UniProtKB/Swiss-Prot annotation:
Signal peptide (UniProt feature, chain positions): 1-22
Native organism: Cyriopagopus hainanus
Propeptide: 23-48
GO molecular function per UniProt: toxin activity
Subcellular location: Secreted
Name of this protein: U4-theraphotoxin-Hhn1c
Length: 85
């Protein structure tokens, strides 16, 4: 009787762990499908870098502190480059 009970509890625990791992794997695969390809991310980074540098150069010529207005959405301008905050 004890052996049967232990076997049932063990099988139930393995089933729960397997189901949890499968759900995590499915969630990760869905996140990967939604994200942008690396080439698009690189283009966005280059665009942010250019906007920040151009904005900074314009403000420096006017003898103003370099307050970046182009770096938004979790980015800030530092040393003429947009960096992730």
């Amino acid at each position: 009787m004890k052996v049967t009970l232990i076997a049932i509890v063990t099988c139930a625990a393995v089933l729960v762990l397997h189901t949890t791992a499968a759900e995590e794997l499915e969630a990760e695969s869905q996140l990967m499908e939604v994200g942008m390809p690396d080439t698009e991310l690189a283009a966005v980074d280059e665009e942010r870098l250019f906007e920040c540098s151009a904005s900074c150069e314009i403000e420096k010529e006017g003898n103003k502190d370099c307050k970046k207005k182009k770096c938004k959405g979790g980015w800030k301008c530092k040393f003429n480059m947009c960096v992730k905050v």
